[in-house]
A protein has these predicted regions:
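Short, hydrophobic transmembrane alpha-helix segments
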Residues: 28-37
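Aromatic-anchored segments of alpha-helical transmembrane domains
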Residues: 21-28, 69-80, 140-151
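N-terminal membrane topogenic signal
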Residues: 1-18
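Hydrophobic cores of alpha-helical transmembrane segments in multi-pass inner/ER membrane proteins
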Residues: 46-55, 108, 112-123, 180-194
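Membrane-interface capping segments at transmembrane-helix boundaries
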Residues: 192-206
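Membrane-interface transmembrane-helix boundary segments in multi-pass integral membrane proteins
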Residues: 151-189
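Interfacial segments of alpha-helical transmembrane regions
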Residues: 53-70, 128-141
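Membrane-proximal helix-loop-helix units in multi-pass membrane proteins
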Residues: 78-140
Length: 206
């Protein structure tokens, strides 16, 4: 099987350049407002790896980020929509979109959360779903959770210190990280993996 990343760099002849153009705008804009630490967030790593997957034409990278992003971005959209139409957040995590201390143009760039699931479904449909993406994404998330602990409790990147709903923090730290990863895998990653495996299975040998 192997874990080769590259597959067909010509798979997305136009979209790969669109992805590069997006990164040229998005990375400096985000870095100037939120700093480089923000790129440790799972959702922002997903942007970087999706664009890499489009550039390389890699089913493995695109599949892993489809597993990571489709349901998570749907939750983001529901929370933002709830705030917009009902005046309150259902889950939290999109409060910054209404924070006038951040430039409006940069906040609007976060609307990529609405586009990313569609982009990933389209991309995976084009190249096929690689089921190894599920395991790769669990490995990526696990590594990011560990790294996120070094950012400090106040930042709480990727909820590595406390959960976003009840603010609970499990001790010792490995228990909290393991519980967080298990939650991500069971609630977000596994259902998406099963759905994509059924819908966009790649032919044997590819």
């Amino acid at each position: 099987m192997g874990w080769s990343i590259a597959a067909d760099s010509s798979a997305f002849p136009r979209m790969r350049w669109a992805a590069a153009a997006w990164l040229a705008v998005w990375i400096p804009a985000y870095a100037s407002v939120w700093g480089p630490r923000n790129f440790l967030l799972l959702c922002d790593i997903a942007v970087l790896l999706t664009c890499a997957g489009l550039w390389l034409g890699s089913p493995l990278l695109l599949s892993s980020q489809a597993v990571s992003s489709i349901l998570a971005d749907a939750v983001w959209a529901v929370d933002a929509g709830s705030r917009l139409f009902l005046g309150k957040h259902l889950f939290g995590g999109t409060e910054y979109m209404w924070d006038a201390s951040f430039p409006l143009a940069v906040r609007l760039l976060s609307l990529f959360h609405l586009v990313w699931p569609v982009l990933l479904v389209w991309a995976v449909r084009r190249v096929g779903y690689d089921p190894r993406g599920f395991g790769l994404q669990i490995a990526i998330a696990g590594a990011l959770l560990v790294v996120s602990r070094f950012a400090g409790r106040a930042a709480n990147l990727n909820f590595a210190f406390r959960d976003p709903i009840w603010g609970l923090s499990l001790e010792p730290a490995p228990l909290h990280l393991a519980a967080t990863l298990a939650f991500l895998a069971a609630v977000f990653y596994l259902p998406t993996h099963l759905l994509l495996s059924r819908a966009f299975r790649r032919p044997q040998g590819l």
